[in-house]
C-alpha cells in the first residue's frame, strides 16, 4: 500500500441488551463478489451493518459470506463505549492482515464509532487498512471502495452529513418477522463518561413521513415487529407538515395503525426525556410492547450529577411510578455503571436501594471504562479493581435474582410470542420472544414461523422459558 490516506471534506455538521432480528440483507441481482461484516456493539450497529450489506449488494453486487477467508471486502463495524471493545477491533484487524500477506486483493474497512473517534490514526496503527468510515457515511462505501482501487491508497471519511445516509439507502429488505428501523442519529446529552456525541454527532431526527414509509414497506414484506432505534430515541422530533414536529409518542401511534404491525419496541431511551406523551402511548397503544429499557446508570444523586445525567434518583422513580400506573406489570430493564470515579460505598448502596425499589428485570451492568476525550476521563479514580469487581458481582447477582423471579411468576400464564424460527437447542421445536424479551421454546409446526402465537409457559429455565401452544 502506498501514499497517504485521502480524507473526504467534511459535510454539513450534524448530529444500545436486548436482541432483535435486524432488517435482512439485500440479495444482489448479480453476484460479483463476497462481503464479510463483523459487528460489535449496540443495535444501531446491527442496523448499520445490515444497511452496509444492502448498499454494497445494490451497487457492487456483493453477497454476504460467513467467512472472511472467502470475502473480497471485509468490514468491521466498531464500538467505542468501552476500552476492551476498542482493543478487540485492532486484534481482529491483525488476524485479517494475514489474508493480505497471502497475496489476496481483499479490501479491509473499519466503520462505526472507533472509526469516527480515531480517524486517520487507524491507518497509522494498521497501515494495511483500506477504508475508514463513520456511522454517518456508510452510504458512501461504494465510492470509497472505488476510490481505494483507483487511487491505490486508503480512504477516510468520518464526516457528519446529518441524515444524508438515509436519503441514499436502498429500499429496506426484510428477513424474518422483526426489523430495526433507525429514526434518529446521535446524542446531545454529553454525559461525562460517554463518547457517543463525539463519535455519532448530536441529535438529528429523520423526517416523520420517511420513517412511516419505511415501516410500511417492511410490514408489506411480512415484518410484524418494529424496533425503533436511536442513541436517545425518546428525544425524537421528526419534521412533518408545515414546520411541525412529531415526537416519539405520535410516531408510535401512527406506526401502530399500519396494517400488519403487531408489536412495537424502541431503544435506547434517556430518562430525562421520558415524557408524559410516551407514557400516554403505553396507555393507549396495545402494540407497544410491555417492556422498557431505560438506563439509569446509578442510584446516587451525587454520582448522577458527576455523570451529568440531568435527573435525580427520585425523578427517575417518579417516571417509573407514572408508567406503572398505566402498565402495572411492565418489565423495566436498565444500564448500570459501577466504580465511577469518586463512587463511595454509600453511593453504591443507594444504587442497590434503587434496584430494590424498582425491581429491575434483566439489565446491563459494567465497570466504568475511562474513555479519552470525555470529561470523566480527568476525574481521579481511587477505587480499587477488587472493589469494583465486588460491587459489580453483587449488583448483577441481585438483578439476576429478581429477573429469575419474574420468569418464575410467568409459569402458568399465557404469553404472546413472535415466532422467530427453529430452536437452536432442538430443531424440532420453535423459538420466539415474549413481550418482556424472554426466549421461549415450544413444540409447534413450522408454519407458525413469523406469526404471533399464544403459549402457556410451563417451565422457567436460567436463560429461557419452555411452553406449549394454546389449543386453537
Swiss-Prot record:
It catalyses: N(6)-dimethylallyladenosine(37) in tRNA + (sulfur carrier)-SH + AH2 + 2 S-adenosyl-L-methionine = 2-methylsulfanyl-N(6)-dimethylallyladenosine(37) in tRNA + (sulfur carrier)-H + 5'-deoxyadenosine + L-methionine + A + S-adenosyl-L-homocysteine + 2 H(+). HAMAP family: tRNA_metthiotr_MiaB (MF_01864). Binds 2 [4Fe-4S] clusters. One cluster is coordinated with 3 cysteines and an exchangeable S-adenosyl-L-methionine. Its EC number is 2.8.4.3. This is tRNA-2-methylthio-N(6)-dimethylallyladenosine synthase. It comes from Stenotrophomonas maltophilia (strain R551-3). GO terms for cellular component: cytosol. Residues 173-407 form the Radical SAM core domain. Residues 408-471 form the TRAM domain.
Amino acid at each position: 500500500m502506498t501514499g497517504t490516506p485521502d480524507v473526504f471534506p467534511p459535510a454539513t455538521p450534524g448530529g444500545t441488551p436486548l436482541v432483535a432480528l435486524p432488517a435482512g440483507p439485500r440479495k444482489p441481482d448479480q453476484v460479483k463478489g463476497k462481503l464479510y461484516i463483523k459487528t460489535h456493539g449496540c443495535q444501531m450497529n446491527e442496523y448499520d451493518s445490515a444497511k452496509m450489506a444492502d448498499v454494497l449488494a445494490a451497487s457492487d453486487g456483493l453477497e454476504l459470506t460467513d467467512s472472511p477467508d472467502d470475502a473480497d471486502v471485509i468490514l468491521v463495524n466498531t464500538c467505542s463505549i468501552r476500552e476492551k471493545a476498542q482493543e478487540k477491533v485492532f486484534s481482529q484487524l491483525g488476524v485479517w492482515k494475514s489474508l493480505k500477506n497471502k497475496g489476496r486483493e481483499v479490501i479491509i474497512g473499519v466503520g462505526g464509532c472507533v472509526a469516527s473517534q480515531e480517524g486517520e490514526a487507524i491507518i497509522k496503527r494498521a497501515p494495511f487498512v483500506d477504508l475508514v468510515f463513520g456511522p454517518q457515511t456508510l452510504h458512501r462505501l461504494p465510492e470509497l471502495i472505488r476510490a481505494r482501487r483507483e487511487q491505490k491508497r486508503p480512504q477516510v471519511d468520518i464526516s457528519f452529513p446529518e441524515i444524508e445516509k438515509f436519503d441514499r439507502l436502498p429500499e429496506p429488505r426484510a428477513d424474518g418477522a422483526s426489523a430495526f428501523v433507525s429514526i434518529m442519529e446521535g446524542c446531545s446529552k454529553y454525559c461525562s463518561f460517554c463518547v457517543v456525541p463525539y463519535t455519532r454527532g448530536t441529535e438529528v431526527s429523520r423526517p416523520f413521513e420517511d420513517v412511516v414509509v419505511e415501516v410500511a414497506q417492511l410490514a408489506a414484506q411480512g415484518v410484524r415487529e418494529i424496533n425503533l432505534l436511536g442513541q436517545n430515541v425518546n428525544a425524537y422530533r421528526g419534521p412533518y407538515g408545515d414546520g411541525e414536529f412529531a415526537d416519539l409518542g405520535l410516531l408510535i401511534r401512527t406506526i401502530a395503525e399500519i396494517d400488519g404491525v403487531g408489536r412495537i419496541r424502541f431503544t435506547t431511551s434517556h430518562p430525562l426525556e421520558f415524557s408524559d406523551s410516551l407514557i400516554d402511548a403505553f396507555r393507549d397503544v396495545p402494540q407497544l410492547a410491555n417492556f422498557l429499557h431505560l438506563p439509569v446508570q446509578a442510584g446516587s444523586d451525587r454520582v448522577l450529577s458527576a455523570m451529568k445525567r440531568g435527573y435525580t434518583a427520585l425523578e427517575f422513580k417518579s417516571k417509573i411510578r407514572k408508567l406503572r400506573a398505566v402498565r402495572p406489570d411492565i418489565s423495566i430493564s436498565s444500564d448500570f455503571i459501577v466504580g465511577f470515579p469518586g463512587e463511595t460505598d454509600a453511593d453504591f448502596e443507594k444504587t442497590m436501594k434503587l434496584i430494590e425499589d424498582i425491581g429491575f428485570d434483566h439489565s446491563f451492568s459494567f465497570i466504568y471504562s475511562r474513555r479519552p476525550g470525555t470529561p470523566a476521563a480527568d476525574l481521579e479514580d481511587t477505587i480499587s479493581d477488587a472493589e469494583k469487581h465486588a460491587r459489580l458481582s453483587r449488583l448483577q447477582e441481585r438483578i439476576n435474582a429478581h429477573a429469575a423471579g419474574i420468569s418464575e411468576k410467568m409459569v402458568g400464564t399465557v404469553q404472546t410470542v413472535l415466532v422467530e424460527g427453529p430452536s437452536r437447542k432442538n430443531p424440532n421445536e420453535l423459538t420466539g420472544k415474549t413481550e418482556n424479551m424472554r426466549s421461549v421454546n415450544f413444540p409447534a409446526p413450522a408454519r407458525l414461523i413469523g406469526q404471533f402465537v399464544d403459549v402457556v409457559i410451563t417451565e422457567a429455565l436460567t436463560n429461557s422459558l419452555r411452553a406449549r401452544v394454546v389449543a386453537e
